[in-house]
Amino acid sequence: YGDIGGITAVVQSVYKLLNRFQQDLRGLIILLRVKIMLGDRNKAVATAEQIWEIGGSLDDVFEEAYIDSLLDLGLLEMASVLLKPRFENLAAALPFFYPVMLKFTIIGGSIKFMEKLTSSPHAPRREDMLFDFIDVYRLMNYGEHFKNIQRLILDNAKSALCGYGYQLYNDRGFTDLELVLYLDDETARGSMLKSELEVKINAYCASAGVKRANTLSVVVRSAAAHPARVTAERQ
């Protein structure tokens, strides 16, 4: 997202490469990231699926970028196939793949795997705020509800999703998890989706007979409002 002024040049260079080598995975992954940066979900998904069909091995840098792109598009099942061997060998995976692995567990709502990652001696950093979030949800016996709510959010946002981020805050004395969903720039349904999610999350909690946790919130924005894009466009 960081260099909007250079996107056109990047696209032209990538297309020249792909004209010569139509199945060049690295070029296609760069093109995929560009489509996501531009908020062009349909073309991004098509490119992600093209890469999937070609298959083959990738350097860690490009595999990580591809997995992150799949997560930004809400293609969790595809990402899970690539991450499964990483979860089976944390010692080798975490030094490089930790950010996308953690993002995957948060999107999927897996308290179990969030804890497995953050408590691993191979984790590259301490996650004190996330430890607190996990502990609270365990004490509340809220793990399964968290997973169901995350699935509900993804199911309702996926058709327009072009970015999935999160922030952790502890300014209230405990950890809040804020999910940030970036929608395809062609959609103008951000506020509508936000309202739909609030209604459906409340309905789920009511039907499950649980109080809604006030430590999880959702923000919906246009892909054009991604902070890196906004910063770059002002420069």
Residue locations for each model-derived region?
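Helical scaffold of the NTase/Pol beta-like nucleotidyltransferase catalytic core
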Residues: 128-158, 163
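Short hydrophobic/aromatic beta-strand micro-patches
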Residues: 180-182
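A short amphipathic beta-strand at an alpha->beta junction
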Residues: 164, 203-234
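C-terminal modules of long, charged coiled-coil scaffolds in eukaryotic assembly complexes
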Residues: 173-175, 184-196, 200, 219-232
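Short edge beta-strands and adjacent turn/loop segments
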Residues: 124, 157-178
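Short, non-transmembrane amphipathic alpha-helical segments
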Residues: 149-153, 189-212
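N-terminal alpha-helical interaction modules that lie
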Residues: 1-20, 135-148, 185, 191, ...
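Alpha-helical protein-protein interaction scaffolds
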Residues: 1-121
